[in-house]
Amino acid sequence: SDSARAKLSQEVLQTLVAENADIIAIQETKLSAKGPTKKHLEILEELFPGYENTWRSSQEPARKGYAGTMFLYKKELTPTISFPEIGAPSTMDLEGRIITLEFDEFFVTQVYTPNAGDGLKRLEERQVWDVKYAEYLAELDKEKPVLATGDYNVAHNEIDLANPASNRRSPG
């Protein structure tokens, strides 16, 4: 596609390839419950041939094709992978929002934090989520250091927003 969004997506992918990172965390994958399609996997293999992937998608009764997270990590790395449930409200634990990689000396975890929703309809649930996720990180940190990555759905400054003017009063 020649759209600006498609061009930007290609630029982001090329930047990720050029960075040659050991671990790449991706949020809001919106994959089906079955995960990446054959085509998705072919593209990942083409762009990131030296990487393994692990993913977590939204599972019923949560919404289909919603949220989701994925890690790409170099094949020589051998983490223990977990998909923790943190006791979040409603279906949030089933929305594919957290993946944790455990290594000998540390954890790498990623999150796609739920937003508070239009009209702040999920604000109370979001506040419970924040407490539960903080407790989860604290438990990991008791064992070994934690690198916590992801989309926290918080915009501290205008630079954190793609469109600051239109998002000024939007929930995170």
Language model features: what each stretch is:
Residues 1-45, 55-66:
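N-terminal, active-site-proximal structural segment of metallo-dependent hydrolase catalytic domains
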Residues 19-20, 47-51, 104, 143-144:
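Structured helix-beta-strand junction loops
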Residues 35-37, 50-52, 91-92:
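Short amphipathic alpha-helical surface micro-motifs
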Residues 49, 66-68, 97, 104:
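Residues that flank catalytic or metal-binding motifs in active/ligand-binding sites
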